[in-house]
UniProtKB/Swiss-Prot annotation:
The lineage of its organism: Eukaryota, Metazoa, Chordata, Craniata, Vertebrata. Belongs to the RAP1 family. Residues 1-91 form the BRCT domain. The gene is terf2ip. GO terms for cellular component: chromosome, telomeric region; cytoplasm; nucleus; shelterin complex. Residues 267-281 have a biased composition (Polar residues). GO terms for molecular function: telomeric DNA binding. Its main location: nucleus. Acts both as a regulator of telomere function and as a transcription regulator. Involved in the regulation of telomere length and protection as a component of the shelterin complex (telosome). Does not bind DNA directly: recruited to telomeric double-stranded 5'-TTAGGG-3' repeats via its interaction with terf2. Independently of its function in telomeres, also acts as a transcription regulator: recruited to extratelomeric 5'-TTAGGG-3' sites via its association with terf2 or other factors, and regulates gene expression. The keyword Ubl conjugation does not apply. It comes from Xenopus laevis. Residues 92-136, 248-365, 400-427 are annotated as: Disordered. PANTHER family: TELOMERE REPEAT-BINDING FACTOR 2-INTERACTING PROTEIN 1 (PTHR16466), TELOMERIC REPEAT-BINDING FACTOR 2-INTERACTING PROTEIN 1 (PTHR16466:SF6). It is found in: Nucleus; Chromosome, Telomere. It holds the Pfam family Rap1_C. This is Telomeric repeat-binding factor 2-interacting protein 1.
């Protein structure tokens, strides 16, 4: 026998027959400190956390359930010096009476079996009624044990049935949830909806800025182009439609008039393609008379022409762009350009232009506009072609999209056929096309990035690749450009602190170029 004070119980008290220690768990508290010494001294283990297979100790009245074992189990094991049956101390209340220890039960069974055999022999022989009472007691004990075993089996069967019911209910709930998710999910986009999104973006994105904002998509929702929210439409375009050419879109008004649309990829511009856009022409002595005669046949064709005013304006506009003008026909060119810029164009104006050009041709020997009208009627000489140089745009005009001043377009053309500005403009265009193909961006986005980086190609590439400038300074914004034009010392000081003196100087030179 062991006492609680001296801890004289066996060191293998809480050890199973196979040598594994019995594990216990009890919430922290003074009772845990008291039981900890008893369990550790008896060879058991005290777990810091709940683990599978560990006995959950609890005081009676604090927690109830078949998984909890009363703390009296440890105290009784220490007092009796043996490992008792744990089911007798469970706090579920299903067992009516306590079972005895394993050793005592085994001894009783052996004794009962011996007494039972003796009683049977005595009954057979016909000995006294005491043996009959012992046999009846033994029979009652066997019947009670059988009833207890039947109760345990019925409990296990009930637990299995409950587990099966729980699994079936869980499967039903999961199927219902999946059905609800499938029913309440977002409807997939159809091909017609994708085409409608692409057409609307193509026709309206240039007027509303980039597609990364919300103005374009909110307007699309307000116009009820699709029966969807603007968030869903934007998400569909950004993740699935942007940059893809899988759909055949209908032609827009701009594409019918031979204007490049936004969805078409930009064609590379080379020097050869630029020089071949206009038809070369030369004049031979003696062709003026034949030209005036052919103009007489060209004028009736002009009167009987059934072209729309917009097509005639396009023809006049292409004439003014593709063919350089001579000094003698500048006043005629002014009238043609003004008519192409105006909204109202009529056939009477084109007739007046043709008659004016024919008179000018008869007075000074013919000019370029007349030769363009009767382009198919001219005889081309074998002499080398003479091309007049075109005005090259400056860096700031090309990046910011500014039109050159009208006064410069009306001045005389320089006599120099090639200049460093031409090569600079060609190199800039090739660099822009390279960045467009490298970063999969439009010309508008690349030029905006170039504008924000003072026109520096290396800094622009670094900005498009990483989102920041290589020198660590921020990119220029519109407000700072306006402040830079003010003659304010405090503003200049603030800009220098923000962008650096070198960047401020470069920005001033860039805006002035």
């Amino acid at each position: 026998m062991a006492t609680l004070g001296g801890l004289t119980h066996s060191h293998t008290l809480f050890v199973e027959d196979d040598g594994t220690p019995v594990r216990f768990y009890i919430p922290p508290g003074p009772l845990k400190r008291q039981l900890y010494q008893l369990i550790i001294h008896g060879g058991g283990e005290m777990c810091r956390l709940q683990q599978p297979g560990a006995l959950l100790l609890s005081t009676p009245g604090s927690a109830q359930g078949a998984q909890y074992v009363s703390t009296a189990y440890v105290m009784d094991c220490v007092r009796k010096g043996e490992l008792l049956h744990v089911d007798d101390y469970r706090l579920d209340g299903s067992h009516g009476r306590k079972r005895q220890s394993k050793g005592m039960k085994q001894d009783e069974r052996e004794g009962e079996s011996s007494h039972g055999s003796d009683g049977k022999e005595q009954v057979k022989v016909g000995e006294g009624p005491e043996e009959e009472d012992e046999l009846s007691d033994l029979g009652e004990l066997v019947i009670e044990e059988g009833l207890e075993e039947d109760e345990q089996e019925s409990d296990t069967v009930k637990i299995k049935k409950e587990n099966k019911m729980d699994c079936s209910e869980a499967q039903k709930i999961g199927s219902l949830k999946s059905a609800r998710i499938h029913q309440t999910g977002r409807n997939p986009f159809t091909e017609e909806e994708d085409v409608a999104i692409l057409v609307y973006v193509r026709d309206n994105a240039p007027h509303r800025g980039t597609v990364t904002g919300i103005a374009l998509w909110k307007e699309m929702e307000q116009r009820r182009v699709l029966k969807r929210t603007w968030q869903a439409i934007k998400d569909r375009y950004i993740k699935h439609l942007k940059g893809k050419q899988g759909y055949r879109l209908p032609l827009s008004a701009a594409s019918r008039s031979h204007d490049p649309s936004e969805d078409e990829s930009p064609q590379p511009i080379t020097k050869k393609s630029r020089t071949n856009t206009s038809t070369p022409w030369t004049k031979r002595p003696g062709n003026i008379g034949r030209t005036s005669e052919k103009l007489g046949t060209a004028l009736p064709m002009e009167k009987s022409s059934t072209k729309a005013p917009a097509e005639q304006s396009d023809a006049v506009e292409s004439t003014s762009i593709n063919f350089p003008l001579e000094k003698r026909g500048q006043h005629v060119t002014k009238g043609v350009v003004r008519r192409s810029e105006g909204e109202k164009k009529s056939s009477d104006m084109s007739k007046g232009a043709v008659s004016a050009t024919s008179k000018e041709d008869q007075e000074d020997g013919g000019d370029l506009h007349i030769f363009e009208i009767a382009n198919m009627e001219f005889e081309v000489d074998d002499t080398p072609e003479i091309e007049l140089p075109k005005r090259s745009l400056s860096l700031r005009e090309f990046v910011m999209g500014e039109d050159p001043p009208s006064s410069q377009s009306q001045t005389q053309v320089d006599e120099v056929s090639s200049s460093p500005e031409d090569s600079e403009s060609e190199g800039l265009q090739e660099a822009l096309l390279g960045m467009m193909s490298e970063f999969k961006l439009r010309l508008r986005d690349v030029t905006q990035a170039l504008l924000k980086n003072n026109g520096e190609l290396s800094a622009t590439r670094h900005f498009l690749r990483t989102g920041s400038r290589p020198d660590g300074f921020p990119i220029w914004i519109r407000k700072d450009d306006l402040d830079l034009q003010k003659a304010d010392a405090e503003t200049q000081k603030r800009l220098i602190q923000k962008y650096g003196s070198d960047n401020v100087a470069k920005r001033v030179a860039f805006l002035a170029s």
